[in-house]
Amino acid sequence: MADTKKNDNYAIDMDKLDAESDRFRPPPQPQPRHSSSSHSQSISNSPVLPILSYCASSILMTVTNKYVLSGVQFNLNFFLLCVQSVVCIIAIQTCKSMGLINYRDFNSDEAKKWFPISLLLIGMIYTGTKALKFLSIPVYTIFKNLTIILIAYGEVLWFGGSVTGMALFSFGLMVLSSVIAAWADIKHALDTSGFSGAEATSKISTLNAGYIWMLINCLCTSTYILGMRKRIKLTNFKDFDTMFYNNLLSIPILMIGSFIVEDWSSENINKNFPIETRNSLIFAMIFSGLSSVFISYTSAWCVRVTSSTTYSMVGALNKLPIALSGLIFFGDPVTVPSVSAIVVGFISGIVYSLAKVKQNAKPRTGVLPTTNPVSASTQSMRDGLKS
């Protein structure tokens, strides 16, 4: 402290001497102006633009997928995912050739190691599209929070992780918001059907299918993320390396799955792509593929300009506009229970993010269960995952 204080006083004295000696110096030479470049650099380093870009790309991705899947007759889910993967590969390869991004070239040994992760990714995205087809965007977003619980306890079992009391409280809020959302959905289905037998049964069965797909999606998502953590440790992949291998290895599987499972008759194609909306649907499919690239870029931009803590908070706050987008663009029912579920789910995300911040600051305070010390590499991998 004494040395620091001496240095501070010395700095102040030198500033005074410099100020007094300015009058004996010749006038400074005019410097060339770089107003435009400095202005653009200040904008790119401002935290506002990357945060807004990340939120916008997340909303666009969800809304475009819902727009494609909301068609009554749409059932080509494997084809949709294949188009998105192809668009993503073309986009990032173009960016790499232009020198905007960089990632590893294809390696067969790395592809073999990463192939199981690509299978899990296909399962995660496919079940997500099926759930989004049957459920509204707010309900889908709320139930997606349950994945956080599975990942947290998966870390406890596989990586020596821990769950704090505050995180446990946020998990309770997540479960509560999911129960409220399901109750609101079922109540609205019964009210709109007038409690008539056939129509009510049809709507309830549709919701039940959505809940089942959502449960499978939560399991696939948590398994994918936990498995990816272990594989990244082996391959040392970066963000764009992961994106490249995930999409490239997924394309042949999705193509085979689409040709084997899905109906490619002319009648079914006309049902999936009606003439009056065909162009807009194709554009939405391509745009959703580009949105995945935007999300990866803007998330990395957000972490670089701000911090991983700010990024995790933005991810929690972003659930609110995503849920509201369903109410705005798709006419999802606006009722007291549905809005309450959104609010509780939003609060649970905030509480969980704060719990992670406190846990990283004081990792041994109020931790459940008690864990043994872990290695630095394991701790860094744990901190790198921001659910």
Curated annotation (Swiss-Prot):
Localization (cell): Golgi apparatus membrane; Cytoplasmic vesicle membrane; Endoplasmic reticulum membrane
Lumenal face residues: 64-71, 130-136, 185-206, 263-280, 330-332
Pfam families for this protein: EamA
Bias kind Low complexity: ranges: 32-45
GO cellular component, one term: Golgi membrane
Sorted UniProt keywords: Cytoplasmic vesicle, Endoplasmic reticulum, Golgi apparatus, Membrane, Sugar transport, Transmembrane, Transmembrane helix, Transport
Lineage: superkingdom: Eukaryota
UniProt feature, compositional bias: Basic and acidic residues: 1-25
Membrane topology: Multi-pass membrane protein
Ranges annotated as biased composition (Polar residues): 368-381
Cytoplasmic side: 1-42, 93-112, 154-162, 228-241, 302-309, 356-387
Major localization listed first in the record, in broad terms: Golgi
UniProt-annotated stretches for the region Disordered: 1-45, 366-387
N-terminal signal peptide: none
Keyword Nuclease: no
Transmembrane regions: 43-63, 72-92, 113-129, 137-153, 163-184, 207-227, 242-262, 281-301, 310-329, 333-355
Assembly notes: Homooligomer.
Function: Involved in the import of GDP-mannose from the cytoplasm into the Golgi lumen.
Family: Belongs to the TPT transporter family. SLC35D subfamily.
Name by which UniProt lists this protein: GDP-mannose transporter
